[in-house]
Amino acid sequence: MFLAGSFIVLCGLLAQSTAQLAGLPYPLGQDLPMSMGHCRSLHVGQTLPYYGVTPVVSTYPSDHLDRNFRDAFRHGLLSGGILSFLEHIPLLNYVRPTGSNAGGLVGVLGKVISSIPLLNNILDIRVTNPQLLEIGLVQSYDFHRLYVTIPLGFDLRVNTLVVGSLLELSVKLDVTAEVYAVRDSYGRSRLVIGDCIYPPGSLRISLLNRLGPLQNLIDSLTDILTRVIPGLVQGVVCPLVNGVLSLLDVTLAHDVADALLRGVQFVIKT
C-alpha cells in the first residue's frame, strides 16, 4: 500500500503555463459568451456523462486527497482574483437599452432590451459582497474525471430614477468545471480542463427589499439579468480554472492525476 503523501514525483514538474485572466470575455456589441476557448457548453437538459465502466476497486490510501484538492482549488481561485473580477462586471452596459448613454447589446437580446423602456429608469448597477462559497467535488462513475462545482454569490445594488428607490438583489449561481488527467508520450501526467459550464437552473435571483411601485421594473430587470449573468460569470470563471490547474502544487497535481488515470475513487461523499 502506498501513501499519497509519499509518492515519488517521477513525472517531473508540470508546465507552469501562464493563464490569461481576462476581466470580461467580449466587448460590447458582440453576443454573450456561452463558453471560453476550449470550455464547451452542454446542451440544455444534458446531464453529466455516464461512461458505463465498472469502477476499479483499489486500496489507494487517499483519505485527504479530495480535501487538499478542494482547498488548493479554492485558494487558486481567490488568489487569481475571482472576487474582484465579479465585483467589476459592468452589468449596466448589458442591461440599459440600445441608444442609452451606457450603450447596450446587439442581436436578439439587444432587441428585447430596447423594447423595455422601463429599463431606462436604471441609473447604475453595482456588484457588492462577492463570495466564493463551498466548492463541491464529484467523481465520474468510472472515477476518471472530476466535476468541480464553483458556487458563487453576490448582491446587486440598483439605483433608479425614482427618488429613494434602491433595489437590492441577491444572486447565486454555479459554474461546473470538468477536470481529467492526460499522459504524454514521455509518461508525464497533468490535469486539464474539459467542459466548463453553467448548469441550467442553478441561477437564483431574489429581492432583498420590497418596493411595490417598482414591481414591473423588478420583473423586467430580473428577466434580463437571468439571460445576461450566466454568460458573463462563466466567461470570468472558466479561464481562471484553467490557470488554477496549471499552478497547483506539483505533488498534489501528480497524485490527483495519477488517481484519475488509475480510475481510483478518492472523493469522499459527505
Swiss-Prot record:
Keyword field: Disulfide bond, Secreted, Signal
Disulfide bond positions: 196-238
InterPro entries per the UniProt record, alphabetical: Bactericidal_perm-incr_a/b_dom, BPI_fold-superfamily_member, Lipid-bd_serum_glycop_N
GO cellular component: extracellular region
Any one GO molecular-function label of the UniProt entry: lipid binding
Record flagged with keyword DNA-binding: no
Tissues of expression: Expressed in interpapillar epithelium of the anterior part of the tongue.
Protein name per Swiss-Prot or TrEMBL: BPI fold-containing family A member 5
Native organism: Mus musculus (Mouse)
Gene that this sequence comes from: Bpifa5
